[in-house]
Amino acid sequence: FLLLGLGMAIVLSLVIWLKVHPFLALIIAATVVSFSTPEKSLKSYAENYTQSQKDRGKMTDSSAKQFKDDFAKVSPMKRVVQEFGGGCAKVGLIIAFAALIGKCMLESGAASKVVMVIISLFGEKRVGLAFLCSGFILAVPVFFDTVFYLLIPIAVAMAHRTGGNYLLYVLCIVAGGTMAHSLVPPTPGPLLVAEEIGVDIGAMMIGGLGIGIFTVTFGYFYAKWASKKFKLSPPDLPDDRLSDEGYMPSTFMSFLPVILPVLLVTGGTLHGIFKLEGFEILKVLGDKNLALGISAMVAFFVLYRSCSGDKERLKNSSSDAFSSGAVIVIITAAGAAFGGVLKQ
């Protein structure tokens, strides 16, 4: 508990007070905790880890003994590096692909198309509910801050066009976006949780969607109540994203990058549960890295079509996506390193 308190104090102090980048704060905290961990705790961790691996059939007695002997010789800094590398291996490709999917959807107009379709389905009298669903769907492949900045101008335009409650729209966007971002992979938080506790990624998706539906329902009713109690006027924005639909792809191609990974990973999960003979392709395509990779290629194709094969734009969009994704990867991996040395 002392090392946990020390590590958390270092992270919070560096991030909140000294405004240090979260990556550096987490690595510094992980290093301090690693060097401060007593040998007794390391032996206990190695014993518990090897026992759990033997119970799962992943280790034999000889390999467990070899692991404990090798682990005792690992230096504190190398343990940090190993945990960091393990975190990258677990989530690196998935986050990179998710970043590319999100960027391609934004640049191609697919994200705006998704919003427009949902609004048309619900009707202008239930725009708040439409924003709730839009935020939830888009925040699965797209990071929450991007979803927020995408939807807010549309909410402003809808408030001016229909005279609707702007605060209701904003709260619905926040409720839908935050719940998907917190509960449904491939967003980094739930993805890392699934990897750390050994939960199948497909099961995490299904469970996150189920819990998310419940929580966003509560969020919607709170938004309805709060929007009647408080008032918020929409700002004037010249960017009306509802008026320009010429660049938008088809409805099917707009939804495909979001739906495809869920279907593929779910198929792989069902294959593992029911042992479907003759359908091994479901297991192959259900690999989370491959599923996100295929979806990223679909999203990239949608962008390619929307920009008529403009190579410079494709290159810039990809570079921007991987730049933003890389930051998330190293922060997530640093968090894995910090969590790993705390467990040790």
Please place each PLM-identified region on the residue numbering.
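Core transmembrane alpha-helical segments of multi-pass membrane transporters/permeases
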Residues: 27, 52-112, 136, 285-344
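Hydrophobic transmembrane alpha-helices that form the pore/transport pathway of multi-pass ion
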Residues: 119-203, 207
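Long, contiguous bundles of hydrophobic transmembrane helices that form the permeation core
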Residues: 37, 41, 206-317
